[in-house]
């Protein structure tokens, strides 16, 4: 109901995370009412090194892991594989994925390129990368190494380390399309 009210109030899009996990059919219901382009599924993901079970397993730094979906602002694990989840959300009507790496969020060490690449390659809807941007080069890196549609950054702007305009100029200088 809350998402419906937000869209009826004039918002272009609404992002849903915990609500989608608890009631996945809400994605289809909202999509049918407002259109796919309005429905963003926010997916908070953390690497899980307990690889028991049927998960998409990856190896990094000599360790095996899978990408697990978290809810309640990244505080509660779900046991849901992020790759399978994003595919399901697309099939239910999501128009976009807002992908946040819990592991990288707040570190200012760059985006989780492996996670972003895997999610982008598993869906055909736009993916927005989030979590970890500490400098303009991190944004350039995620655009060049993945087919991500957009990149979200907070810390570099909150602490006025870089201006939005300067970051956009640097992105454009690196051959990445951006609105100036």
Residue ranges with predicted function:
Residues 26-45, 108-135, 174-176:
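Alpha-helix-loop-beta-strand connector modules within alpha/beta enzyme cores
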Residues 103-105, 133-136, 157-158:
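Short Gly/Pro-enriched loop/turn and capping motifs at secondary-structure junctions
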Residues 3, 24-28, 83-87, 113-117, ...:
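Generic structural signal for well-ordered alpha-helices
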Residues 26-34, 140-180:
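C-terminal helical cap(s) of enzyme catalytic domains, especially alpha/beta-barrels
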Residues 16-17, 72, 129-130, 153-154:
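Thr-Gly-centered strand-to-loop micro-motif
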Residues 5-8, 28-30, 54-58, 111-114, ...:
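Short, glycine/charged-enriched secondary-structure capping and boundary segments
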Residues 7-99, 103-104, 175:
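Conserved anion-binding
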Residues 1-10, 49, 114-151:
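Catalytic cores of alpha/beta
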């Amino acid at each position: 109901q809350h998402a419906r009210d937000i869209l009826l109030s004039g918002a272009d899009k609404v992002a849903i995370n915990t609500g989608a996990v608890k009631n996945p059919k809400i994605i289809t219901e909202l999509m049918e009412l407002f259109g796919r382009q309005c429905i963003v599924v926010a997916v908070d993901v953390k690497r899980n090194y307990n690889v028991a079970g049927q998960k998409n397993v990856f190896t990094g730094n000599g360790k095996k892991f899978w990408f697990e979906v978290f809810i309640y602002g990244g505080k509660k694990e779900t046991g849901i594989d992020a790759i399978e989840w994003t595919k399901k959300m697309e099939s239910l009507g999501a128009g976009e994925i807002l992908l946040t790496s819990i592991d990288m969020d707040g570190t200012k060490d760059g985006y989780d390129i492996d996670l972003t690449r895997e999610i982008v390659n598993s869906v055909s809807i736009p993916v927005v990368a989030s979590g970890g941007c500490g400098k303009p080069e991190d944004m350039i890196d995620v655009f060049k190494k993945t087919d991500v549609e957009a990149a979200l950054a907070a810390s570099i702007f909150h602490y006025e380390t870089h201006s939005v305009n300067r970051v956009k100029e640097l992105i454009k200088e690196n051959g990445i399309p951006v609105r100036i």
